[in-house]
Amino acid sequence: KLRPMDCYKETAPGELTNCVGHDDLMMLMFTSGTTGRSKGVMLSERNMCASLHTYSEVAENWIITRLPAGQKLPLSHMTLLPLFHMACFVCVMSYPPAGWALNLCGDIRDFYRDLGLMHSDVMASAPMLVETIYNDMKRGRVSRLNGLWDLCCSSAALDPKMLLELAQNGFVVNQCYGMTETFGDGILNFTQVEKHMSAVGKPDDHVQYKLDETGEICIKGDCVMLGYYKDPEATAEVIDADGWFHTGDLARMDEEGFYYITGRKKNLIILASGENVSPEELEKKLALCPAITECIVKEKSQKICAVIYCPEDKQEEVRAFVIEVNRSLPLYKRISAVEFTVEPLPRNALGKLLRK
């Protein structure tokens, strides 16, 4: 039975008073720590309300306007993301008030079983699972998805070709960008237009966004955290005197206002020549090689090195591909060394590559 959110007032033993302020510490959530140590993010009720306003609008307006033919309300949402991940927490807080069912899958090994038991229309996911669903589609095994049709993905960029094929086969794929430090509030891509498939979308209208002179995304508004727990130095490094939160993510914006993530500021390889190289840019080019399972680009002895995980019998094919990639690059961006690994590259619980 659905009850109004203020129904507790009917049975309250006395007059209700506010016990905390909107800007008091409400919760601590930790960053993923892919490029350094994990930090505790202090968040307030004001931060939460600013973010949930955006995601409730998404649930009520955007997704519902794209219902497949014959689909009835209310919808149901599944997440495999852990509850300590901000994207999962936002889903838990946003969708039930809109009347949606919320399905939680506790173990990715049970994904197809749980999807069969709990029909889900929409799913919040990491890139690796979207790739799995894409492979199911390619193999003609869409029926095992039990009607799942909308995929919301964050954490890392998806291959535009894969996104286009999913869209052409009836899926709605939404890339989005957000951070723990902004209570998940960020940039949302609602378009299914081919030329914008690789964008993370347009910024939330309720928050201020800008790209600084280096191309770093900066955010200002009620969603920005109180600071890092017991770490005023780290807080001062990312929140400037004017209240702008410097995300550390680099992006470009096209003439229509769509943002495209180009890399992480901390990941930039700074060569002795003074040139800056984005490893993510090179990794995207290498990922086009069918023989490469995983790769990561890093600096080693002032050289650009690619660490590649692939079958041993494909190594010569990969070397030849790297040569072709280098021919398309300026001299300072070229990959000087290739290392092969027999083990998958280390990732965190969210599937992000660890660069430490």
Per-region residue spans from a language model:
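AMP-binding/adenylate-forming catalytic core of the ANL superfamily
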Residues: G221, L226-G227, L250-K333
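Conserved AMP-binding/adenylation subdomain of ANL enzymes
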Residues: C49-S76, L83-L148
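ANL superfamily adenylate-forming
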Residues: K1-H22, M137-R139
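Flexible lysine-rich "adenylation lid" loop at the C-terminal edge of ANL adenylation domains
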Residues: T341-K356
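Conserved ATP/PPi-binding loop(s) of AMP-dependent carboxylate-activating enzymes
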Residues: K202-D205, D212-V238, F258, E275-V277
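Conserved pre-ATP/AMP-binding loop-to-beta segment of ANL
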Residues: T11-F30, G36-R37, R66-S76
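Conserved AMP-binding A3 loop
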Residues: M26-H53
